[in-house]
Amino acid sequence: MWLLFRSKHKKLVLRCFPSGKLGETEPNGSPLAYLSYYAASNSSKLRKVAHFLGSRVRHSYYHKRDNEVIIGLKICKTLVQKCRDNINVMASEVVNMLLVASSSKNLEVLSACVDCFATFCDNSGKGSPATFGNEFHSAFNNLVNSFFELSKGIDCVDPQQSKMLGLKAFHALTACKFAGTEGGMRYQPHFAIHCVLINSWSESDQEKKSFIDLVRSTAKSYKPLPPSSTGVSLPEHDEAGDNIDVAIKKLCIRILFNIYTQTDPLFMAESTKSLIHFFAAKSDTPVNLEYISVVLNQILDWTPVELRHSIFFCCLRCLSSSRIVNSETNVMVPYMIYSILNSKNSISGLSVIDVLRDLGSHLINAVNSFDADDQTWYNMCESPSEKLPRRLYLLLVCITCLTKHQYYDEEFADVWREIDTLANSETSSAIQMVALTAFHKLQNEKLNTKKESSAPLSLVTDFLLHSWPKSAERLHTSQSPFVRIKTAEVFYEFLCFLRPSLINFDTILRKSAITSFSVLWDFIYETSWHIERWLKVFSVQSEFYILKLIIQRLYQLYGPVSVTAVLPAMYRGLRPFENDPPRCIAEAVTAYYIIYIGENLKITTLQSSGRKWLDSLSSSLPSSLLNRGSSTHSWEKLTNASTEEVMLPLDMVVNELLEKSPKVFPEDSRLLFAEQSRHPKYTDIIQKLKKPSREKSFTSSSEYSLPFISPASDYQQNPLLHATKSLVSIHQQSQRGEMVSTLKQALSRPHTASTVVRSPSEINLTRQTSNRVPLLDMLNLNRAMSPTPIQSPPYVRT
């Protein structure tokens, strides 16, 4: 009788509920099938059915009729499946029903609620969330919040089952289009990621290691799931044979997979922010660091390549986030950045220079926040991983890791130059020493490889040959001896990476000056000029020791040719100013160099003369300097004592070299020792260059030189570095046999002085019958053959 006076849609709904059967939780099959047909036939009928079913479920819930609630949810699930084309008509009622049922403490009711929610998410493809209205979004957000509370497993009869149900709900959410960030749904990403973190993180190191192993063993096999009921609601067999704890962790990994593969970029970015803030609050322990690294690298691997940069920039912005306690001293966020940069996954679209400048500003702040003297900073930079403040060290390795993946050809060069600019001579000694530590790590990581003939390695080496002369200016511009020593040590390590060159006087004097040795020739002269200036500002004994190593290494690399540049430079560095008497300490290191040359060339007269010179200085020198084998650090101040005159003049040394070793030092090499042979960049003799002539130019591809080549190659040009550039001018050659003037021929004839100063590109090499080219013109070719300056990327403001 109770059905006679009811509307048809109400009758159809009520007939689906079993009558008089206690404990029954399944709806009547035939009435449910007809109800589905009736509701699907018309949208107004569906709206009425959904509204009445919702009121029926709420009524049953408030009267604690759990079985009827379960039946109502199953009816709702069937209607969602059958009426998916009109899902937007019933969406608000469905969500309100689920919101009521999610407040239950009965696990069976909660299970039916989650199943219905998963079905709703799976069949929501026909409707647009934007058409559901504000009421739907508000209720849906409350429902997500309710599922989040459920995933905590608090105040439940079975916490583990409760967590499992909550995670299944978030698995369904992150696999559907309702996962959003608009309006009232902006908290969904934070709920989703925190439900994963609170169920996968543990204070027990053993459990964290267990989760790490699970990620490594299972995450690689995950694939994007199709929009089906099996894909949205976790397959039943996924937990078969596993205990509930392992099943929970597997489901956490699955939700992470959904967030970074199936949600929109904004949802993913908001989730990442919450992930970073969660990890930032953890302690700096090895297990925690491993956990964070594994999770970050795995989600980076899942994330589409074009979106990976968003994860990185979320970490970068969190370096100074107000939501992180003591963000200016936090070490976990820099570690996350390091973990991403050091991973095998490259990040397309990464603006390397912008990132470097951002990291550099934080690096400077970290240096300035630590108060210490120069010697303390030097000692810390000797063992940076152990002694530098943790945050500072992590920021340092983040910068050096920017070159781990090559995003464009000139990336290494840009990073090196940016660091060099960041720590210019106007910055503090501490910042300069930290920058030099970065140089040390950069060149070690790039050059410390067995593939010496590889193209990238050759490119890096060629760049450093051009760049170190500028970076080495700290040898004499810095007022701090610790900065000078650190510069010398890093520069010496670079020299140790180079292989000995075949450059010799025969190469220089009897071949055209346009050779692949021009970069090496320029490098030798630039280095010798720095040595000259450095000798004038020596102040501690450690500088004495490291200079000895540098000049010895230059001889090992370039042989007697280096002597023609280094020895005159050392003699010029004996006097701090032009009219000052020579300093004893500068004389001592010069005497050591002469002894070293004599030993290598087996010229006993040079050895004995050098020792006599050194003995004559013994009364003015610390006894520790007289021990030639000593190479330990000593911060003892050097004496400023001077002598009236130099005991062993340069002319006497040069005469001895040419007389006793004519095969090594031919007579033509005498001019290279003279004052006039100084590098044109640092002498007034450039004013004597001849006027340019109007002659047809030709191009040369010999722009770079390579120190990493086999001895038999005679430094052939690197085809990978081939670049066409107008270097010099010659007369038109009508015959193949006509040759340009050699350096030896140019040296043999005087040149005509001119008051006109020419640029390197205006220098001419002429035939033997034409006017001879002065020595300086030939050496000046080095400058003309320097590589084209590296252009900044278009996104970098100049």
UniProtKB/Swiss-Prot annotation:
Pfam families found in the cross-reference section: EFR3
Cellular component terms (Gene Ontology): plasma membrane
Alphabetical keyword list: Phosphoprotein
Record flagged with keyword Phosphoprotein: yes
Record flagged with keyword Phosphoprotein: yes
InterPro entries: ARM-type_fold (IPR016024), EFR3 (IPR039786), EFR3_HEAT-like_rpt (IPR049150)
Residues that bear Phosphoserine: S210, S726, S729
UniProt-listed GO biological process terms: mitotic actomyosin contractile ring assembly; phosphatidylinositol phosphate biosynthetic process; plasma membrane organization; protein localization to plasma membrane
Family: Belongs to the EFR3 family.
Protein name stated in the entry: Protein efr3
